[in-house]
Amino acid sequence: MNTPLDDLLAAYGCGPVLATAPAEGITFTVIVRTQGTRPNSLGEALDSLATQTFPDFDVVVVVHGTDEIADEVRAGADERLSGRLQVVAVTGGGRSQPLNAGLDHVTGSHFCFLDDDDLARADWLRSFADAAAESPTAIIRAVTETQAWTTEGGVEPVRAVGSIERPFPDRFDLLAHMSLNLTPICALAYPRLVIDPLGLRFCDDLPVYEDWDFLMRAAMAVGVVSIPQATSLYRRLDAGNADSAASVPTWERAHAMVIDRLSTHPVLLPVGDARRLAGTHYVTDGRSRHEADLAAAEARLDRLTRSPRHWAQAFAARASAAVGHRRAARRP
């Protein structure tokens, strides 16, 4: 499978620049991000890595905290990961800081991420590896399931309070991801070429959505192969993770920042998506016809709900029309 970038170059008679399979075979570096404040949860995440059925991987635990916390994490690491685990401490910066520090320690042909509130199923890496063997230069996307967990007033996940759900689509769709993120970070395995030679990094300016921004820029360059297996579990905590820690305005501002960043560079779409774009019927003011129709409908609804007189007139008109239709239906 050629990357989208190589397909574009081939259309202009240029040779591929990225379509090179890793010479050493498929191996993984797993980057685990933690603040070190949830040792039990981190231990469970590392336990899930210790039971992987695919053997060729190393683990980089990046502690967003002090060296002392990193030493505690190192001391409590699962013995089954002995020899393949390193712990790195970073300070300062936001959520991207530990991710970028992890990228500096990637040794595998591919890398993937597991936050300390995520759990990997035993076939997590095996599923990635099987797909990567067929498409070594593409991002591999599996399915992540979610489950609500309570912290009972603390910071650690204590017990599940809901059933396991599957809210994310089975297949990656670049156009759908232009509007919102539909892929948790633990659902993805990236080929190392996105950081070398492409040089992608996580954006330090984003307080949240740093994973969505990184995914979109990488996906347009190398493409995404989807596999339908559910291989990881994202535990939605009632306190302490990004969903609950960041305010709604923070999420909204970060969303706008990601869209702005996407808008500053050319967009490379998969083959076939031009037909879907044509179906949105863009108009000359820059919006799609769907957006214009939706805005008009919302404005009309706003007028009706704000003005009892307009609402009453609209209701009377609809009632009169309904009576007329019934009378017409009774006529021979």
Placement of each model-derived feature along the sequence:
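Short aromatic/hydrophobic "clamp" motif used to bind/position activated sugar donors
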Residues: 111
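Short beta-strand/loop segment that forms part of the nucleotide-sugar
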Residues: 56-68, 86-91
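Conserved nucleotide-sugar donor-binding catalytic segment
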Residues: 30, 168-255
